Amino acid sequence: MKKVVAVVKLQLPAGKATPAPPVGPALGQHGANIMEFVKAFNAATANMGDAIVPVEITIYADRSFTFVTKTPPASYLIRKAAGLEKGAHKPGREKVGRITWEQVLEIAKQKMPDLNTTDLEAAARMIAGSARSMGVEVVGAPEVKDA
């Protein structure tokens, strides 16, 4: 078992990582091969379009590394579904867009591997909460039952 030196978490554009900051400094300070990571990451995420991809890079004592890509952030997927550039300036006071419950379910299905639940309904409620906190209205959501 190799000794772990560092675990670096970054959010990078799919297929477009470069050795420039934030990648270079984050990996360089731990002695990992930056170009090797950039090539491997870009190859692994080339088919994901223009999404932002969270990645967790584990760097070992022998300067080798492994990385795990996660699903794009909920906020990115919600903005994409609502066709927005960014969330509300004053969430709760202003609504900047709306998404349907069906879109929420689609996002929840996509995010399932990274969420701490196996229940699609619970995952959808998490996504709906994220949407509301961004000032995006969720249309057609079922009534919430008190637990």
Curated annotation (Swiss-Prot):
What is an example of a GO molecular function annotated in this UniProt entry? Answer: large ribosomal subunit rRNA binding
One GO BP annotation is: translation
Q: How is it modified after translation?
A: One or more lysine residues are methylated.
Annotated keywords: Methylation, Ribonucleoprotein, Ribosomal protein, RNA-binding, rRNA-binding
Q: Which CDD domains match?
A: Ribosomal_L11
Fetch the Gene3D superfamilies from UniProt: Ribosomal protein L11, C-terminal domain (1.10.10.250), Ribosomal protein L11/L12, N-terminal domain (3.30.1550.10)
Q: Which GO terms describe its cellular component?
A: cytosolic large ribosomal subunit
- NCBIfam families (alphabetical): L11_bact
Name the family the entry cites: Belongs to the universal ribosomal protein uL11 family.
Per the entry, what this protein does is:
Forms part of the ribosomal stalk which helps the ribosome interact with GTP-bound translation factors.
PANTHER family attached here? 60S RIBOSOMAL PROTEIN L12, LARGE RIBOSOMAL SUBUNIT PROTEIN UL11M
Give the record's subunit note. Answer: Part of the ribosomal stalk of the 50S ribosomal subunit. Interacts with L10 and the large rRNA to form the base of the stalk. L10 forms an elongated spine to which L12 dimers bind in a sequential fashion forming a multimeric L10(L12)X complex.
What is the official name of this protein in its record? Large ribosomal subunit protein uL11
The gene name on file is: rplK
